[in-house]
From Swiss-Prot:
Keywords: Repressor, Ribonucleoprotein, Ribosomal protein, RNA-binding, rRNA-binding, Translation regulation, tRNA-binding
Entry protein name: Large ribosomal subunit protein uL1
Molecular function per GO: rRNA binding; structural constituent of ribosome; tRNA binding
Keyword Ligase carried by entry: no
Chain segments annotated as coiled-coil in the UniProt record: none
Gene from which the chain derives: rpl1
Length: 213
């Protein structure tokens, strides 16, 4: 599956989606084969930096206090301080809303025990447990990386679907992002892309377009 084949599928996916009054996302769908995914070592659990970026902003929440909280606030990130964290632990509905609204979480390392107790039951199943950082960390590089990152966690399922851009991006940009994900799949398994049964691209409101092998 090279860039030209992926670009062809992206072009087809565009034709299969009716115009909408919002910018549609583009996803990559991958079906895996001949893998025992009940074995943890065969599962894909990766964070992948998309070379072309995501084409949209990613909301990031920082669980912190003191200087780190102030730095996060200056960067326009969502800040969750200790008292708010404790309240979220008592309000599962609010905790779920926070979890669903944010793509990634960063937490001051010495607050991780409280994070685990208050938000762990909500963030854990979503694969969004925070990245711990020291209280004097420079958040800028980590935030920049997260804004270009997507997460894959197949668990025991042979199919995964992952965001690779928006319809406003060029076919080349979207294809480069898809290639980055397929390269991770290829490196994960000894037989590489042999384990990909099929792959597709799809816009939010459109049908899936197959990527030729």
């Amino acid at each position: 599956m090279d860039s030209a084949q992926i670009q062809k599928a992206v072009k087809e996916a565009r034709t299969l989606a009716k115009p909408r009054n919002f910018t549609q996302s583009v996803d990559l769908i991958v079906n895996l084969k001949e893998l025992d995914l009940t074995r943890p070592e065969n599962r894909l659990k990766e964070q992948i930096v998309l070379p072309s970026g995501k084409g949209k902003d990613t909301k990031i929440a920082v669980i912190a206090k003191g200087d780190l909280a102030a730095q996060a606030a200056e960067m326009g990130l969502t800040v969750i301080r200790q008292e708010e964290l404790e309240e979220l632990g008592k309000n599962k509905k609010a905790a779920k809303r926070i979890a669903n609204e944010h793509g990634f979480f960063i937490a001051q390392a010495d607050m991780m025990p409280l994070v685990g107790k208050s938000l762990g039951p909500v963030l854990g199943p979503r694969g969004k447990m925070p990245q711990p950082v020291p209280g004097n960390a420079n958040l800028a590089p980590l935030v920049a990386r997260f804004k270009k990152t997507v997460a894959i966690n197949t668990r025991d399922k042979s199919l995964f679907q992952v965001y690779i851009g928006t319809e406003a991006m060029s076919d080349e940009e979207i294809a480069a992002n898809a290639e980055a994900i397929l390269n991770v799949v290829a490196k994960k398994y000894e037989k590489g892309l042999y384990h990909v049964k099929s792959a597709f691209t799809k816009l939010t409101m459109g049908a899936a377009a197959p990527i030729s092998k």
